[in-house]
UniProtKB/Swiss-Prot annotation:
Ranges of compositional bias, category Basic and acidic residues: 535-553
Name of the coding gene: NPR4
Subcellular location: Nucleus
Domain of life: Eukaryota
Pathway(s) it belongs to: Protein modification; protein ubiquitination
Protein name listed in UniProt: Regulatory protein NPR4
BP GO terms, sorted: defense response to bacterium; defense response to fungus; plant-type hypersensitive response; protein ubiquitination; regulation of jasmonic acid mediated signaling pathway; regulation of salicylic acid mediated signaling pathway; regulation of systemic acquired resistance; response to bacterium
Subunit structure of this chain's protein: Forms homodimers, homotetramers and heterodimers with NPR3 in the presence of salicylic acid (SA). Interacts with TGA2, TGA3, TGA5, TGA6 and TGA7. Interacts with CUL3A, a core component of the cullin-RING ubiquitin ligases (CRL). Binds to NPR1; this interaction is disrupted by association with SA, probably due to conformational changes.
Function text: Salicylic acid (SA)-binding substrate-specific adapter of an E3 ubiquitin-protein ligase complex (CUL3-RBX1-BTB) which mediates the ubiquitination and subsequent proteasomal degradation of NPR1 in the absence of SA. Together with NPR3, acts as receptor of salicylic acid to monitor immunity in a NPR1-dependent manner and induce systemic acquired resistance (SAR). Involved in the regulation of basal defense responses against pathogens, and may be implicated in the cross-talk between the SA- and JA-dependent signaling pathways.
The species this protein was found in: Arabidopsis thaliana
Annotated GO MF terms: identical protein binding; protein homodimerization activity; salicylic acid binding; zinc ion binding
Family assignment from sequence similarity: Belongs to the plant 'ANKYRIN-BTB/POZ' family. 'NPR1-like' subfamily.
Effect in UniProt of substituting residue 459 to G: Slightly increased salicylic acid (SA) binding
Induction note: Up-regulated following pathogen challenge or salicylic acid (SA) treatment, and down-regulated by methyl jasmonic acid (MeJA) treatment.
Gene3D superfamilies, alphabetized: Ankyrin repeat-containing domain, Potassium Channel Kv1.1, Chain A
Length: 574
Protein backbone atom coordinates (compact mmCIF):
# COMPACT_ATOMS: atom_id res chain seq x y z
CA UNK A 1 0.00 0.00 0.00
CA UNK A 2 2.88 2.29 0.84
CA UNK A 3 4.45 1.49 -2.51
CA UNK A 4 1.42 2.55 -4.48
CA UNK A 5 1.12 5.76 -2.48
CA UNK A 6 4.28 7.26 -3.99
CA UNK A 7 3.47 6.31 -7.60
CA UNK A 8 1.86 8.94 -9.86
CA UNK A 9 -1.84 8.37 -10.38
CA UNK A 10 -2.96 7.27 -13.84
CA UNK A 11 -5.97 9.59 -13.62
CA UNK A 12 -6.35 13.24 -12.69
CA UNK A 13 -8.81 14.25 -9.99
CA UNK A 14 -10.87 17.31 -10.85
CA UNK A 15 -12.25 17.72 -7.29
CA UNK A 16 -9.44 20.02 -6.25
CA UNK A 17 -10.35 23.69 -6.53
CA UNK A 18 -6.70 24.40 -7.48
CA UNK A 19 -6.93 22.15 -10.52
CA UNK A 20 -10.44 23.10 -11.52
CA UNK A 21 -9.63 26.83 -11.31
CA UNK A 22 -5.98 27.21 -12.35
CA UNK A 23 -4.36 30.62 -12.07
CA UNK A 24 -4.09 32.75 -15.26
CA UNK A 25 -0.29 32.46 -15.12
CA UNK A 26 -0.39 28.65 -15.18
CA UNK A 27 -2.99 28.64 -17.97
CA UNK A 28 -0.91 31.03 -20.06
CA UNK A 29 2.23 28.95 -19.47
CA UNK A 30 0.53 25.72 -20.53
CA UNK A 31 -1.06 27.39 -23.56
CA UNK A 32 2.31 28.75 -24.70
CA UNK A 33 3.98 25.39 -24.14
CA UNK A 34 1.26 23.60 -26.10
CA UNK A 35 1.54 26.07 -28.96
CA UNK A 36 5.31 25.67 -28.97
CA UNK A 37 4.93 21.90 -29.16
CA UNK A 38 2.36 22.20 -31.95
CA UNK A 39 4.68 24.52 -33.85
CA UNK A 40 7.58 22.06 -33.52
CA UNK A 41 5.40 19.16 -34.62
CA UNK A 42 4.24 21.01 -37.72
CA UNK A 43 7.83 21.91 -38.52
CA UNK A 44 8.57 18.19 -38.74
CA UNK A 45 6.30 18.07 -41.78
CA UNK A 46 8.78 20.33 -43.55
CA UNK A 47 12.11 19.08 -42.26
CA UNK A 48 11.73 15.39 -41.40
CA UNK A 49 11.88 13.02 -44.43
CA UNK A 50 9.95 10.41 -42.42
CA UNK A 51 7.00 12.82 -42.28
CA UNK A 52 6.77 13.35 -46.03
CA UNK A 53 3.04 13.19 -46.71
CA UNK A 54 3.01 16.13 -49.10
CA UNK A 55 0.40 16.37 -51.84
CA UNK A 56 1.64 19.20 -54.11
CA UNK A 57 4.90 20.53 -55.53
CA UNK A 58 6.13 24.05 -56.22
CA UNK A 59 8.73 24.11 -59.01
CA UNK A 60 11.25 26.92 -58.73
CA UNK A 61 13.13 27.91 -61.86
CA UNK A 62 16.65 26.49 -62.28
CA UNK A 63 16.22 24.23 -59.24
CA UNK A 64 16.49 20.49 -59.80
CA UNK A 65 14.29 19.50 -56.84
CA UNK A 66 10.78 20.95 -56.42
CA UNK A 67 9.54 22.10 -53.01
CA UNK A 68 6.91 19.71 -51.66
CA UNK A 69 4.02 21.19 -49.66
CA UNK A 70 0.80 20.19 -47.89
CA UNK A 71 -2.17 21.86 -49.53
CA UNK A 72 -4.27 21.73 -46.37
CA UNK A 73 -1.68 23.72 -44.38
CA UNK A 74 -1.14 26.35 -47.07
CA UNK A 75 -4.87 26.71 -47.73
CA UNK A 76 -5.56 27.20 -44.01
CA UNK A 77 -2.88 29.90 -43.70
CA UNK A 78 -3.15 31.76 -47.01
CA UNK A 79 -6.20 32.92 -48.96
CA UNK A 80 -4.06 32.93 -52.11
CA UNK A 81 -3.35 29.22 -51.81
CA UNK A 82 -6.92 28.47 -50.73
CA UNK A 83 -8.23 30.00 -53.96
CA UNK A 84 -5.47 28.33 -56.00
CA UNK A 85 -6.14 24.83 -54.68
CA UNK A 86 -9.92 25.23 -55.00
CA UNK A 87 -9.50 25.47 -58.77
CA UNK A 88 -7.72 22.11 -58.86
CA UNK A 89 -9.95 20.37 -56.32
CA UNK A 90 -11.47 18.06 -58.90
CA UNK A 91 -8.18 17.40 -60.67
CA UNK A 92 -7.28 13.74 -61.23
CA UNK A 93 -3.58 14.51 -60.70
CA UNK A 94 -2.41 12.97 -57.42
CA UNK A 95 0.32 15.52 -56.73
CA UNK A 96 -0.30 18.67 -58.76
CA UNK A 97 2.71 20.77 -59.75
CA UNK A 98 2.82 24.57 -59.74
CA UNK A 99 5.47 26.78 -61.34
CA UNK A 100 6.64 29.58 -59.05
CA UNK A 101 7.00 31.92 -62.05
CA UNK A 102 3.29 31.39 -62.84
CA UNK A 103 2.28 32.23 -59.27
CA UNK A 104 4.19 35.54 -59.17
CA UNK A 105 2.91 38.45 -61.27
CA UNK A 106 6.20 40.28 -60.60
CA UNK A 107 9.46 39.85 -58.75
CA UNK A 108 11.31 36.66 -57.92
CA UNK A 109 11.28 34.20 -55.01
CA UNK A 110 14.19 31.77 -54.81
CA UNK A 111 14.20 28.36 -53.17
CA UNK A 112 15.79 29.47 -49.88
CA UNK A 113 13.42 32.43 -49.51
CA UNK A 114 10.39 30.24 -50.22
CA UNK A 115 11.51 27.62 -47.68
CA UNK A 116 12.01 30.41 -45.12
CA UNK A 117 8.50 31.66 -45.92
CA UNK A 118 7.07 28.13 -45.59
CA UNK A 119 8.76 27.74 -42.22
CA UNK A 120 6.67 30.64 -40.94
CA UNK A 121 3.51 29.32 -42.60
CA UNK A 122 3.89 25.94 -40.87
CA UNK A 123 5.21 27.05 -37.47
CA UNK A 124 4.07 30.63 -36.95
CA UNK A 125 7.66 31.51 -36.01
CA UNK A 126 9.95 33.76 -38.01
CA UNK A 127 13.49 32.43 -37.87
CA UNK A 128 16.73 34.39 -38.41
CA UNK A 129 17.80 34.62 -42.04
CA UNK A 130 20.04 31.71 -43.12
CA UNK A 131 23.63 32.97 -43.28
CA UNK A 132 24.58 31.16 -46.48
CA UNK A 133 22.06 33.15 -48.56
CA UNK A 134 21.65 36.44 -46.68
CA UNK A 135 25.27 37.50 -46.15
CA UNK A 136 28.24 38.16 -48.43
CA UNK A 137 31.77 36.72 -48.54
CA UNK A 138 33.48 39.99 -47.63
CA UNK A 139 35.04 39.28 -44.23
CA UNK A 140 34.90 42.93 -43.09
CA UNK A 141 31.20 43.41 -43.94
CA UNK A 142 28.73 43.73 -41.06
CA UNK A 143 26.02 42.18 -43.29
CA UNK A 144 23.47 44.71 -42.05
CA UNK A 145 22.84 46.19 -45.50
CA UNK A 146 24.84 44.25 -48.10
CA UNK A 147 23.15 43.18 -51.33
CA UNK A 148 22.52 39.50 -50.39
CA UNK A 149 20.74 40.60 -47.18
CA UNK A 150 18.59 43.05 -49.15
CA UNK A 151 17.83 40.56 -51.93
CA UNK A 152 16.70 37.92 -49.44
CA UNK A 153 14.38 40.36 -47.67
CA UNK A 154 13.01 41.57 -51.03
CA UNK A 155 12.23 37.98 -52.11
CA UNK A 156 10.45 37.35 -48.81
CA UNK A 157 8.44 40.54 -49.28
CA UNK A 158 7.27 39.40 -52.72
CA UNK A 159 6.25 36.02 -51.25
CA UNK A 160 4.48 37.60 -48.27
CA UNK A 161 2.53 40.10 -50.39
CA UNK A 162 1.57 37.84 -53.30
CA UNK A 163 0.64 34.92 -51.02
CA UNK A 164 -1.30 37.30 -48.74
CA UNK A 165 0.34 37.04 -45.32
CA UNK A 166 -0.19 40.59 -43.90
CA UNK A 167 1.82 40.15 -40.69
CA UNK A 168 4.89 39.16 -42.71
CA UNK A 169 4.40 42.11 -45.05
CA UNK A 170 4.53 44.48 -42.06
CA UNK A 171 7.60 42.76 -40.63
CA UNK A 172 9.62 42.83 -43.85
CA UNK A 173 8.55 46.37 -44.67
CA UNK A 174 10.14 47.53 -41.41
CA UNK A 175 13.30 45.61 -42.25
CA UNK A 176 13.51 47.08 -45.75
CA UNK A 177 12.97 50.61 -44.44
CA UNK A 178 16.02 50.15 -42.23
CA UNK A 179 18.07 49.13 -45.27
CA UNK A 180 17.19 52.19 -47.36
CA UNK A 181 19.38 54.70 -45.54
CA UNK A 182 22.19 52.27 -44.72
CA UNK A 183 22.79 50.78 -48.13
CA UNK A 184 24.43 52.03 -51.33
CA UNK A 185 21.91 53.73 -53.58
CA UNK A 186 22.23 51.08 -56.31
CA UNK A 187 21.11 48.50 -53.73
CA UNK A 188 18.02 50.59 -52.96
CA UNK A 189 16.62 50.02 -56.46
CA UNK A 190 15.34 46.45 -55.80
CA UNK A 191 13.70 47.76 -52.60
CA UNK A 192 12.06 50.54 -54.58
CA UNK A 193 10.74 48.04 -57.13
CA UNK A 194 9.23 45.71 -54.54
CA UNK A 195 7.62 48.71 -52.82
CA UNK A 196 6.18 49.83 -56.16
CA UNK A 197 4.78 46.40 -57.10
CA UNK A 198 3.43 45.63 -53.62
CA UNK A 199 1.81 49.07 -53.05
CA UNK A 200 3.95 49.85 -50.00
CA UNK A 201 3.45 53.62 -50.08
CA UNK A 202 5.65 54.66 -47.16
CA UNK A 203 8.54 52.48 -48.28
CA UNK A 204 8.16 53.65 -51.88
CA UNK A 205 8.23 57.34 -50.90
CA UNK A 206 11.33 56.75 -48.77
CA UNK A 207 13.12 55.01 -51.66
CA UNK A 208 12.15 57.68 -54.20
CA UNK A 209 13.46 60.41 -51.91
CA UNK A 210 16.73 58.52 -51.38
CA UNK A 211 17.29 57.99 -55.11
CA UNK A 212 16.33 61.60 -55.93
CA UNK A 213 19.01 63.06 -53.66
CA UNK A 214 21.64 60.56 -54.79
CA UNK A 215 24.17 60.95 -57.60
CA UNK A 216 22.70 58.04 -59.57
CA UNK A 217 22.64 59.18 -63.20
CA UNK A 218 19.40 59.65 -65.11
CA UNK A 219 20.15 56.99 -67.74
CA UNK A 220 20.57 54.31 -65.08
CA UNK A 221 17.31 55.40 -63.46
CA UNK A 222 15.51 55.35 -66.82
CA UNK A 223 16.83 51.85 -67.48
CA UNK A 224 15.98 50.39 -64.07
CA UNK A 225 12.75 52.01 -62.90
CA UNK A 226 9.11 52.31 -64.06
CA UNK A 227 8.12 55.53 -65.84
CA UNK A 228 5.77 56.59 -63.05
CA UNK A 229 8.58 56.43 -60.48
CA UNK A 230 11.03 58.08 -62.87
CA UNK A 231 8.80 61.15 -63.21
CA UNK A 232 8.54 61.56 -59.43
CA UNK A 233 12.33 61.38 -59.07
CA UNK A 234 12.79 64.00 -61.81
CA UNK A 235 10.31 66.33 -60.11
CA UNK A 236 12.06 65.98 -56.75
CA UNK A 237 15.46 66.67 -58.30
CA UNK A 238 14.17 69.81 -60.03
CA UNK A 239 12.60 71.06 -56.77
CA UNK A 240 15.77 70.40 -54.77
CA UNK A 241 17.88 72.72 -56.95
CA UNK A 242 15.06 75.05 -58.06
CA UNK A 243 16.25 74.86 -61.67
CA UNK A 244 13.91 73.76 -64.46
CA UNK A 245 15.12 70.64 -66.25
CA UNK A 246 16.61 71.49 -69.62
CA UNK A 247 17.28 68.88 -72.30
CA UNK A 248 20.71 70.04 -73.47
CA UNK A 249 22.37 68.70 -76.60
CA UNK A 250 25.01 66.63 -74.80
CA UNK A 251 22.34 64.68 -72.90
CA UNK A 252 20.43 64.16 -76.13
CA UNK A 253 23.56 62.85 -77.90
CA UNK A 254 24.43 60.62 -74.97
CA UNK A 255 20.91 59.21 -75.04
CA UNK A 256 21.26 58.32 -78.72
CA UNK A 257 24.55 56.50 -78.12
CA UNK A 258 23.08 54.51 -75.23
CA UNK A 259 19.95 53.63 -77.23
CA UNK A 260 22.21 52.30 -79.97
CA UNK A 261 23.90 50.12 -77.33
CA UNK A 262 20.46 48.93 -76.17
CA UNK A 263 19.82 47.72 -79.72
CA UNK A 264 23.28 46.05 -79.88
CA UNK A 265 24.16 48.22 -82.89
CA UNK A 266 27.89 48.89 -82.40
CA UNK A 267 28.26 50.26 -85.94
CA UNK A 268 25.63 52.89 -85.17
CA UNK A 269 27.47 53.74 -81.95
CA UNK A 270 30.65 54.30 -83.96
CA UNK A 271 28.80 56.45 -86.50
CA UNK A 272 27.15 58.60 -83.81
CA UNK A 273 30.49 59.19 -82.09
CA UNK A 274 32.20 60.04 -85.36
CA UNK A 275 29.54 62.54 -86.42
CA UNK A 276 29.19 64.31 -83.06
CA UNK A 277 31.55 66.08 -80.70
CA UNK A 278 30.84 63.64 -77.86
CA UNK A 279 33.24 60.81 -76.96
CA UNK A 280 32.45 57.33 -75.71
CA UNK A 281 33.95 58.30 -72.34
CA UNK A 282 31.83 61.46 -72.09
CA UNK A 283 28.74 59.37 -72.81
CA UNK A 284 29.87 56.74 -70.28
CA UNK A 285 29.16 54.35 -73.13
CA UNK A 286 31.53 51.60 -72.02
CA UNK A 287 30.17 51.79 -68.46
CA UNK A 288 26.64 51.42 -69.85
CA UNK A 289 27.55 48.54 -72.15
CA UNK A 290 29.29 46.67 -69.34
CA UNK A 291 26.24 47.14 -67.11
CA UNK A 292 23.52 46.17 -69.58
CA UNK A 293 24.78 44.81 -72.92
CA UNK A 294 25.52 41.25 -74.01
CA UNK A 295 29.18 40.27 -73.37
CA UNK A 296 29.74 39.94 -77.13
CA UNK A 297 28.59 43.54 -77.61
CA UNK A 298 30.94 44.67 -74.83
CA UNK A 299 33.84 42.99 -76.66
CA UNK A 300 32.86 44.75 -79.90
CA UNK A 301 32.75 48.12 -78.12
CA UNK A 302 36.18 47.45 -76.61
CA UNK A 303 37.52 46.58 -80.07
CA UNK A 304 36.55 50.07 -81.28
CA UNK A 305 39.43 51.38 -79.10
CA UNK A 306 37.45 54.56 -78.52
CA UNK A 307 37.28 54.41 -74.73
CA UNK A 308 39.64 54.58 -71.76
CA UNK A 309 39.08 51.36 -69.78
CA UNK A 310 40.16 53.17 -66.58
CA UNK A 311 37.90 56.20 -67.12
CA UNK A 312 35.74 57.12 -64.11
CA UNK A 313 32.12 58.15 -64.39
CA UNK A 314 30.65 60.98 -62.31
CA UNK A 315 30.23 58.63 -59.35
CA UNK A 316 33.90 57.61 -59.35
CA UNK A 317 33.32 54.13 -60.77
CA UNK A 318 35.69 52.71 -63.38
CA UNK A 319 34.40 50.31 -66.00
CA UNK A 320 35.86 47.40 -64.01
CA UNK A 321 33.89 48.49 -60.94
CA UNK A 322 30.70 48.23 -63.01
CA UNK A 323 31.82 44.85 -64.39
CA UNK A 324 32.37 43.65 -60.81
CA UNK A 325 28.76 44.59 -60.02
CA UNK A 326 27.57 42.50 -62.96
CA UNK A 327 29.85 39.55 -62.05
CA UNK A 328 30.30 38.21 -65.56
CA UNK A 329 33.74 36.62 -66.23
CA UNK A 330 33.40 37.04 -70.01
CA UNK A 331 33.26 40.81 -69.43
CA UNK A 332 35.88 41.10 -66.68
CA UNK A 333 38.59 39.19 -68.57
CA UNK A 334 38.51 41.32 -71.78
CA UNK A 335 38.60 44.50 -69.67
CA UNK A 336 41.71 43.32 -67.82
CA UNK A 337 43.29 42.28 -71.11
CA UNK A 338 42.68 45.82 -72.37
CA UNK A 339 44.48 47.26 -69.34
CA UNK A 340 41.74 47.82 -66.76
CA UNK A 341 43.32 48.40 -63.35
CA UNK A 342 41.97 45.99 -60.72
CA UNK A 343 43.57 48.05 -57.95
CA UNK A 344 41.58 51.25 -58.55
CA UNK A 345 39.30 52.27 -55.69
CA UNK A 346 35.94 54.01 -55.76
CA UNK A 347 35.61 57.34 -53.96
CA UNK A 348 34.39 55.49 -50.85
CA UNK A 349 37.34 53.07 -50.84
CA UNK A 350 36.04 49.93 -52.59
CA UNK A 351 37.95 48.01 -55.25
CA UNK A 352 36.47 45.77 -57.94
CA UNK A 353 37.15 42.60 -55.95
CA UNK A 354 35.66 44.18 -52.82
CA UNK A 355 32.52 45.08 -54.78
CA UNK A 356 32.33 41.54 -56.13
CA UNK A 357 32.67 39.98 -52.68
CA UNK A 358 29.91 42.17 -51.25
CA UNK A 359 27.52 40.92 -53.91
CA UNK A 360 28.34 37.22 -53.57
CA UNK A 361 26.57 34.89 -51.14
CA UNK A 362 28.53 32.12 -49.37
CA UNK A 363 26.28 29.59 -51.10
CA UNK A 364 27.21 30.93 -54.55
CA UNK A 365 30.88 31.21 -53.64
CA UNK A 366 31.19 27.60 -52.49
CA UNK A 367 28.78 25.96 -54.96
CA UNK A 368 30.39 24.11 -57.85
CA UNK A 369 28.91 23.38 -61.27
CA UNK A 370 27.86 19.92 -62.44
CA UNK A 371 31.39 19.51 -63.80
CA UNK A 372 32.87 20.35 -60.37
CA UNK A 373 34.02 23.78 -61.54
CA UNK A 374 33.73 26.96 -59.44
CA UNK A 375 30.61 29.07 -59.92
CA UNK A 376 30.97 32.09 -62.17
CA UNK A 377 30.65 34.36 -59.12
CA UNK A 378 33.65 32.76 -57.45
CA UNK A 379 35.49 32.80 -60.76
CA UNK A 380 35.03 36.59 -60.95
CA UNK A 381 36.51 37.00 -57.47
CA UNK A 382 39.41 34.67 -58.27
CA UNK A 383 40.19 36.53 -61.51
CA UNK A 384 40.26 39.91 -59.77
CA UNK A 385 42.31 38.60 -56.83
CA UNK A 386 44.89 37.06 -59.15
CA UNK A 387 45.12 40.28 -61.13
CA UNK A 388 45.83 42.25 -57.94
CA UNK A 389 48.46 39.69 -56.95
CA UNK A 390 49.95 39.75 -60.43
CA UNK A 391 50.21 43.55 -60.45
CA UNK A 392 50.68 44.58 -56.81
CA UNK A 393 52.78 47.55 -57.91
CA UNK A 394 49.75 49.20 -59.46
CA UNK A 395 48.34 50.56 -56.25
CA UNK A 396 45.51 52.69 -57.60
CA UNK A 397 44.06 55.40 -55.40
CA UNK A 398 44.40 53.48 -52.14
CA UNK A 399 42.29 55.02 -49.37
CA UNK A 400 44.05 56.06 -46.19
CA UNK A 401 41.10 56.71 -43.90
CA UNK A 402 39.09 53.49 -44.06
CA UNK A 403 37.21 52.36 -40.93
CA UNK A 404 38.74 48.93 -41.44
CA UNK A 405 41.65 47.79 -43.56
CA UNK A 406 40.15 46.74 -46.93
CA UNK A 407 40.49 43.01 -47.52
CA UNK A 408 42.17 43.49 -50.90
CA UNK A 409 44.71 45.84 -49.27
CA UNK A 410 45.53 43.05 -46.83
CA UNK A 411 45.80 40.65 -49.75
CA UNK A 412 48.22 42.90 -51.66
CA UNK A 413 50.31 43.42 -48.54
CA UNK A 414 50.42 39.67 -47.89
CA UNK A 415 51.47 39.03 -51.48
CA UNK A 416 54.30 41.57 -51.24
CA UNK A 417 55.47 40.21 -47.88
CA UNK A 418 55.70 36.70 -49.31
CA UNK A 419 57.34 37.84 -52.51
CA UNK A 420 60.07 39.80 -50.73
CA UNK A 421 60.51 36.90 -48.29
CA UNK A 422 60.98 34.49 -51.20
CA UNK A 423 63.56 36.83 -52.75
CA UNK A 424 65.42 36.96 -49.41
CA UNK A 425 65.50 33.20 -49.32
CA UNK A 426 67.31 32.85 -52.66
CA UNK A 427 69.50 35.97 -52.87
CA UNK A 428 69.60 37.54 -49.41
CA UNK A 429 72.41 40.01 -50.11
CA UNK A 430 70.69 41.60 -53.10
CA UNK A 431 67.29 41.55 -51.39
CA UNK A 432 68.67 43.21 -48.26
CA UNK A 433 70.25 46.01 -50.32
CA UNK A 434 66.98 46.65 -52.15
CA UNK A 435 65.11 46.62 -48.82
CA UNK A 436 67.58 49.08 -47.28
CA UNK A 437 67.15 51.49 -50.17
CA UNK A 438 63.35 51.19 -49.89
CA UNK A 439 63.55 51.70 -46.09
CA UNK A 440 61.61 48.51 -45.41
CA UNK A 441 63.30 48.20 -42.02
CA UNK A 442 61.64 51.45 -40.98
CA UNK A 443 58.24 49.79 -41.41
CA UNK A 444 59.08 46.30 -40.14
CA UNK A 445 57.23 46.86 -36.88
CA UNK A 446 53.95 46.69 -38.86
CA UNK A 447 53.95 42.92 -39.26
CA UNK A 448 57.35 41.43 -38.51
CA UNK A 449 56.89 38.90 -41.28
CA UNK A 450 60.16 39.14 -43.15
CA UNK A 451 62.46 37.32 -40.75
CA UNK A 452 62.35 34.41 -41.14
CA UNK A 453 60.87 34.28 -44.67
CA UNK A 454 57.10 34.31 -44.35
CA UNK A 455 55.15 31.11 -44.03
CA UNK A 456 51.59 30.63 -45.16
CA UNK A 457 50.04 31.55 -41.81
CA UNK A 458 50.95 35.20 -42.23
CA UNK A 459 47.34 36.27 -42.60
CA UNK A 460 46.97 35.60 -38.90
CA UNK A 461 49.78 38.01 -38.13
CA UNK A 462 48.29 40.61 -40.44
CA UNK A 463 45.08 40.45 -38.45
CA UNK A 464 46.84 41.29 -35.16
CA UNK A 465 46.41 44.97 -34.46
CA UNK A 466 47.05 47.37 -31.62
CA UNK A 467 43.67 47.89 -29.98
CA UNK A 468 44.69 51.41 -28.99
CA UNK A 469 45.44 52.32 -32.61
CA UNK A 470 42.78 54.14 -34.62
CA UNK A 471 41.63 52.62 -37.93
CA UNK A 472 43.07 55.63 -39.77
CA UNK A 473 46.52 55.16 -38.23
CA UNK A 474 46.42 51.40 -38.78
CA UNK A 475 45.57 51.71 -42.48
CA UNK A 476 48.14 54.47 -42.97
CA UNK A 477 50.82 52.32 -41.32
CA UNK A 478 49.93 49.37 -43.55
CA UNK A 479 50.12 51.59 -46.62
CA UNK A 480 53.57 52.84 -45.63
CA UNK A 481 54.68 49.25 -45.31
CA UNK A 482 53.16 48.31 -48.64
CA UNK A 483 54.82 51.20 -50.48
CA UNK A 484 58.24 50.19 -49.12
CA UNK A 485 57.72 46.60 -50.23
CA UNK A 486 56.48 47.76 -53.63
CA UNK A 487 59.67 49.79 -54.05
CA UNK A 488 61.71 46.70 -53.15
CA UNK A 489 59.90 44.56 -55.74
CA UNK A 490 60.21 47.29 -58.37
CA UNK A 491 63.97 47.36 -57.76
CA UNK A 492 64.11 43.61 -58.32
CA UNK A 493 62.17 43.95 -61.55
CA UNK A 494 64.56 46.64 -62.81
CA UNK A 495 67.88 45.00 -61.96
CA UNK A 496 66.95 41.28 -62.06
CA UNK A 497 64.21 40.95 -64.73
CA UNK A 498 64.79 37.22 -65.30
CA UNK A 499 64.61 36.45 -61.57
CA UNK A 500 61.51 38.63 -61.38
CA UNK A 501 59.86 36.49 -64.07
CA UNK A 502 60.75 33.26 -62.23
CA UNK A 503 59.23 34.61 -59.02
CA UNK A 504 56.16 35.65 -61.03
CA UNK A 505 55.87 32.07 -62.23
CA UNK A 506 55.98 30.59 -58.72
CA UNK A 507 54.14 33.22 -56.67
CA UNK A 508 50.62 31.92 -57.41
CA UNK A 509 51.71 28.46 -56.24
CA UNK A 510 53.38 29.98 -53.19
CA UNK A 511 50.25 31.91 -52.26
CA UNK A 512 48.20 28.72 -52.70
CA UNK A 513 50.62 26.81 -50.41
CA UNK A 514 51.97 24.60 -53.21
CA UNK A 515 55.56 25.74 -52.59
CA UNK A 516 57.15 24.50 -49.34
CA UNK A 517 58.18 26.91 -46.63
CA UNK A 518 61.84 26.07 -46.00
CA UNK A 519 61.84 28.05 -42.76
CA UNK A 520 60.95 24.75 -41.07
CA UNK A 521 62.48 21.98 -43.27
CA UNK A 522 62.28 19.43 -40.46
CA UNK A 523 58.47 19.57 -40.35
CA UNK A 524 56.38 16.68 -41.71
CA UNK A 525 56.96 12.97 -42.40
CA UNK A 526 60.11 11.60 -44.06
CA UNK A 527 58.28 11.47 -47.40
CA UNK A 528 56.96 15.03 -47.01
CA UNK A 529 60.43 16.33 -46.10
CA UNK A 530 61.92 14.61 -49.16
CA UNK A 531 59.24 16.11 -51.42
CA UNK A 532 59.78 19.50 -49.82
CA UNK A 533 63.53 19.39 -50.53
CA UNK A 534 62.97 18.25 -54.13
CA UNK A 535 60.46 21.05 -54.76
CA UNK A 536 62.76 23.57 -53.13
CA UNK A 537 65.77 22.46 -55.19
CA UNK A 538 63.72 22.65 -58.39
CA UNK A 539 62.80 26.25 -57.63
CA UNK A 540 66.37 27.04 -56.56
CA UNK A 541 67.77 25.75 -59.87
CA UNK A 542 65.31 27.89 -61.84
CA UNK A 543 66.29 30.96 -59.83
CA UNK A 544 70.02 30.24 -60.28
CA UNK A 545 69.62 30.05 -64.06
CA UNK A 546 67.67 33.30 -64.08
CA UNK A 547 70.22 34.97 -61.82
CA UNK A 548 73.08 33.94 -64.14
CA UNK A 549 71.14 35.36 -67.07
CA UNK A 550 70.65 38.67 -65.24
CA UNK A 551 74.30 38.74 -64.20
CA UNK A 552 75.43 38.43 -67.83
CA UNK A 553 72.98 41.12 -68.89
CA UNK A 554 74.37 43.48 -66.26
CA UNK A 555 78.04 42.65 -66.94
CA UNK A 556 78.71 46.35 -67.38
CA UNK A 557 78.40 46.81 -63.63
CA UNK A 558 81.36 46.61 -61.28
CA UNK A 559 82.97 43.17 -60.89
CA UNK A 560 82.77 43.49 -57.12
CA UNK A 561 80.27 41.57 -54.99
CA UNK A 562 76.70 41.43 -56.31
CA UNK A 563 75.43 43.37 -53.34
CA UNK A 564 77.88 46.24 -53.74
CA UNK A 565 77.26 46.36 -57.50
CA UNK A 566 73.56 46.64 -56.91
CA UNK A 567 74.04 49.21 -54.17
CA UNK A 568 76.18 51.38 -56.45
CA UNK A 569 73.61 51.13 -59.22
CA UNK A 570 70.82 52.10 -56.85
CA UNK A 571 72.68 54.99 -55.30
CA UNK A 572 73.88 56.28 -58.69
CA UNK A 573 71.09 55.49 -61.17
CA UNK A 574 71.80 56.23 -64.81
Amino acid sequence: MAATAIEPSSSISFTSSHLSNPSPVVTTYHSAANLEELSSNLEQLLTNPDCDYTDAEIIIEEEANPVSVHRCVLAARSKFFLDLFKKDKDSSEKKPKYQMKDLLPYGNVGREAFLHFLSYIYTGRLKPFPIEVSTCVDSVCAHDSCKPAIDFAVELMYASFVFQIPDLVSSFQRKLRNYVEKSLVENVLPILLVAFHCDLTQLLDQCIERVARSDLDRFCIEKELPLEVLEKIKQLRVKSVNIPEVEDKSIERTGKVLKALDSDDVELVKLLLTESDITLDQANGLHYAVAYSDPKVVTQVLDLDMADVNFRNSRGYTVLHIAAMRREPTIIIPLIQKGANASDFTFDGRSAVNICRRLTRPKDYHTKTSRKEPSKYRLCIDILEREIRRNPLVSGDTPTCSHSMPEDLQMRLLYLEKRVGLAQLFFPAEANVAMDVANVEGTSECTGLLTPPPSNDTTENLGKVDLNETPYVQTKRMLTRMKALMKTVETGRRYFPSCYEVLDKYMDQYMDEEIPDMSYPEKGTVKERRQKRMRYNELKNDVKKAYSKDKVARSCLSSSSPASSLREALENPT
